Amino acid sequence: MRNAEKKKFFAKVLLFGEYSVIFDGEAITIPLKQFSGYLDFPAHKAVSDISGKESNQKIRDLFIYLSSPEISSRFHYQINFDSLNDDLDRGMFFKSNIPRGYGAGSSGAIVAALFDQYSFENPIISESTNPKTYGLVREQLALMESYFHGSSSGLDPLSSLLGKPFKLDAQKRISFPDLPLFSGPVKRDVFLIDTGMEGDTHPLVNWFKEQIAKKAFDAELLKGLNNQVVQALLHKNELFFDGFLAQLSLFQLENMKPMIPESIRPLWQQGVNSGEWTLKLCGSGGGGFMLGFAENYHDVKSVFEVAGFTTVLPS
């Protein structure tokens, strides 16, 4: 392993852009620093705990996929597979508290860690990085993460690699905007609702693509609402932000029910009706976390707790 220190790779929250990013919608992602993971070795020669063994095997399966000529020939930055294989033989695993199936980027963090550690030409990623480099890195991360989900935008591993909020625009350009509506005297609180069940990204993405192909709902409307919310957020227009966010929430409730667990639908509808809070998908949905927005999180927290849900404030 290249680095002696155990570098952390954080979970992420995709604030906006889930599904619409598939057809060039804008996206904003932020790190979720309560959860992270890092590459590690067992204290003894063999991995002793079950989770470490499972992680080691998971990375080994990923290694087999990535090292196949069909995949590795498409890399912009070649991976040192010999070094990775040696470290796997020594029991290397990814020690993580990022919940799986929660839309928090658990597989993205693994991909980011492997890319950071084992790419021969590890590009320096910072706010001054050449835009073309961001594009190449994101493309490769998407290809690497496709092992887990069948397809990937590359946003999850890129977020974990960067460890800071960023925006992806319709031309796939990366920028690092301020998010003024989430700080200051006039603001909106963002919180996560734990549905208590795991989601499965792959079948949900397939279902979504099938609906688009059948024109079961208006994909351009979904993208338009998403982009309007993003622009209102960036321009600190709370009136437009609340309005378009409410429309986006209603669109998802009416058209994307497989992504919304039945247990949370009544609270979702209550938010649509009352305006006291607004819920939307967090990542692919189907379980895991859902995203909530409110003028004051502490005023609505008890409603979710009474209904049996745990809530989390991103940090």
Which residue stretches match the model-derived regions?
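C-terminal nucleotide
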Residues: 2-16, 20-22, 29-30, 37-88, ...
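Gly/Ser-rich catalytic serine loop of serine hydrolases
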Residues: 97-109
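Glycine-rich beta-strand-to-loop/alpha-helix junction loops that act as flexible
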Residues: 105-107, 282-287
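Stable alpha-helical structural segments in soluble proteins, enriched in small hydrophobic residues
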Residues: 109-121
